[in-house]
Amino acid sequence: LATAVMMDRSMTLIITDNRGFGCINRLQVGTGGAPFNNLFADSQHEVLPEIDFVAHAASMGARACKAGSIAELEALTAEAINRKGVDVIVIDTDPGPSTAAGGTWWEVGVPEVSERAEVASAYQGWLDGKKRQLG
């Protein structure tokens, strides 16, 4: 961001804040694993991090704001894409909901043998995905 501001580039970034690494958590669960240390609230911690992405972006020279709803996100995005400079729009999101498998098949290794039913099911899904990949 700082470089884009320094170089007088124009871009709009939308940061979806799910308080952790939601996409990795969904991938981990989707491959039969149990959620582990991907979402801040579920990880080992003494103090939960409260990252202020708006302040962080602004500290690097970007115009930054937080959208409180999808309608506000749409309005802020429409404004941002029509002006020069770096804009950052942050919106809080739920880390769980997503398109199936993130909208595409990821070839992520799944154990062939496991005592967990979720892993056995994920392995079968991996085999099916591999067949589709190879045609």
Regions found by a protein language model. Give the residues of each.
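Thiamine diphosphate
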Residues: L1-G135
